[in-house]
């Protein structure tokens, strides 16, 4: 699993993440602050909220790779802290320690694009590990397929949804605080 936190706009890694997700069956979760759009981006907060403890244990990754800075989602923080990971690698050009999920095992000193390019160039394995990756990604996709968008009129959530759906392509929108970011996810 790759979790993408806060990044500047024009960070040039969206296409790499899409390719890695497809080629290696990697689940990519990107925060709105990441300025990343991945085709199969999952609504992970909703998946986490709607999952039982047993399901959350199954959804927890063995390997977590994090790039970027902060994530707004308290749900992803809770999920990864509570259900843990075997390995957590944070990619940092400066080597700074960011242990948001309190599971950090390694810091890889590299810029995001170089690291992701290296991963993308690896040949997908045709063994048990690849089958396991496919099954893991399929778990997330099945949970996503079960989600339906509620239409709760006269609520903050509904108002933000209507606003976002009416915005033109390639518009920049500034959110003033984490609650508005949360509602937009």
Predicted regions and their residues:
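Glycine-rich, anion-gripping cofactor-binding loops and their flanking helix/strand elements
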Residues: 4-89
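Phosphate- and divalent-cation-binding pockets in alpha/beta enzyme and binding domains
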Residues: 11-12, 74-75, 118, 162, ...
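Short loop/helix-cap segments at secondary-structure boundaries that form the rim of catalytic
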Residues: 32-42, 95-103, 184-185
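Phosphate/pyrophosphate-binding active-site segments
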Residues: 80-181
């Amino acid at each position: 699993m790759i979790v993408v936190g806060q990044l500047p706009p024009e960070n040039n890694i969206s296409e790499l993440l899409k390719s890695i997700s497809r080629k290696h069956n990697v689940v990519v979760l990107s925060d709105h602050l990441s300025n990343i759009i991945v085709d199969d981006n999952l609504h992970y907060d909703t998946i986490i909220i709607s999952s039982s403890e047993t399901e959350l244990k199954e959804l927890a990754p063995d390997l977590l790779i994090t790039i970027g800075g902060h994530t707004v989602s308290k749900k992803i923080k809770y999920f990864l802290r509570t259900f843990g990971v075997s390995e957590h690698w944070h990619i940092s050009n400066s080597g700074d320690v960011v242990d948001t999920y309190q599971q950090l095992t390694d810091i890889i000193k590299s810029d995001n694009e170089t690291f992701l390019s290296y991963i993308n160039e690896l040949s997908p394995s045709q063994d048990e590990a690849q089958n396991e990756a496919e099954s893991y990604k399929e778990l997330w996709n099945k949970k996503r397929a079960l989600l339906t968008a509620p239409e709760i009129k006269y609520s903050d959530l509904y108002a933000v949804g209507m606003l976002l759906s009416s915005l033109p392509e390639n518009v920049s929108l500034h959110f003033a605080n984490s609650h508005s970011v949360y509602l937009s996810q």
